[in-house]
Amino acid sequence: MKNDLTNLETKLILSLNDIIKFKSNLSNTSFEHKVNHVMISPNGQNFIFMHRYFNSTGTRFDRLILSDCNGNLLKVLADNGMVSHCFWYNDNTILAYLRSTNGKDSYWLIDINSGNYTGFEPWCNKIRGDGHPSVLNNLVITDTYPDKSRMQSLYLSQKNSNLEYKLGEFFHGFDFNGETRCDLHPRFSLCGNYIFFDSVFSGKRTLYYINITKIKERINHG
């Protein structure tokens, strides 16, 4: 659906059937289909979304699809079984944790024009799994799921750099699981001086923030 906030009009630009048929041989009866994680490009011209479908045994398959904002489906950016979390790196590039054509699950930069994949340094070779990346200007943030010690971590990096900064670790107890689990889901303030995140390390779900102005100074001075 496309919502015009000026005229308060809503228009269907893509149906689920359109998405199912786009560059696939999938049946809309053999699988359960869902669409989620819709994200509009910074320039407002395109958007990406996940086409997620399940077979009769519950096995999940993911596709990452690119469309323009008029509902013209443009390209399947990923169709290798698993797509997790994505963010627009810039108007022409997606940063995503997904399975690439070589079968590797990692952080990848995808050129929406060529479809080429490039490993995102410094995270593409780290063995710590999925996270929730977010980008603002030249800064990139992501998190981790709880490790064996039940600690979740925040990592800050910079575009075109191999450096990363660990901002902290936060305990996630077993009392929070299933629907009550709490991912950190880090995101930048618009000014870029703060990172906000959710956590349960205090024993209840709370929104926290970290001031990163000093770390940004360190990054900018190499």
What does each model-identified segment do?
Residues 1-18, 50-77, 93-94, 100-120, ...:
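Beta-propeller blade-edge and WD-like acidic-aromatic loop motif
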